Amino acid sequence: KYEVPIGNSRFPITDFFDITVEGDAEGPNDVKMILNGDLNRVKYIGCNMSGGEIICNGNVDLHVGAEMSGGSIYVHGNAAAHAGREMSGGYLEIDGDTKEFTGASYIGEWRGMTGGKIVVKGNAGKQCGECLTGGRIHVLGNCDILAGIHMTKGIIEIDGDVNRWPGGQMKNGNIVIHGFLGRLLEGFVLEGVVDDPEIDGEVFEGKYIQYKGDIGLNGKGALLSLIHISEPTRLRCIS
């Protein structure tokens, strides 16, 4: 019998879900859970999971996939804040948008996501990848301010545009931006233009402007911004 905490009380899970079980599972890796319905107020889905698969058909609330170490979560909708925070392994895919702190650390901690992969097919809120120390985040849409702040390792790839100050106070790692780059902090220095850069064995096709930073912290991180033909003044983006 499973119970759901609501405030200071606990209620049987059957009060909220109609549960159907099919087949047998020898362990967590054999479990596939499908959640249908209104999940807007359901928090911590897949938190600390180590294996198996969860499919959420709808929007989900805070902390989906937080601290997960294995398995896969697919969200066919949007996710609230803290998606995939401090995850160390596994795969989290969100069809819609995420709010702030995707793949980030919890308040007071300096180690965010350390492994695994997060794919956001929509837009990501502010401080995506904060304190990233491993793993990979791929945002197919746009990213809000301070993406990759305090990151020390790992890769953040953004297909869309990036708002102000990506990579602030980063010490290492890689941020790859395919869209248009907003304002950078002064701690980034221009290193030049690179063709088809390779990161961890993966080649990113095209010409990229490469910055190094954050030099205010003696950082050795790389920020790569794709050059667009329609943007002849791109080098002025740090002004």
Language-model segments: what does each one mean?
Residues 89, 96-111, 188-196:
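Acidic/polar low-complexity surface segments
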Residues 159, 165-224:
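Short, surface-exposed interaction patches in beta-rich subdomains
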Residues 227-239:
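Single conserved hydrophobic/aromatic residue that forms the stacking wall/gate
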Residues 81-82, 146, 164-165:
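Short beta-strands and strand-coil junctions in structured, solvent-facing domains, enriched
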Residues 36-38, 57, 66-69, 76, ...:
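Feature marks extracellular polysaccharide-active and adherence modules
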Residues 31-33, 45-47, 52, 58, ...:
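The right-handed parallel beta-helix/beta-solenoid scaffold, focusing on the short coil/turn
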Residues 5-70, 74, 80-84, 100-115, ...:
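Right-handed parallel beta-helix
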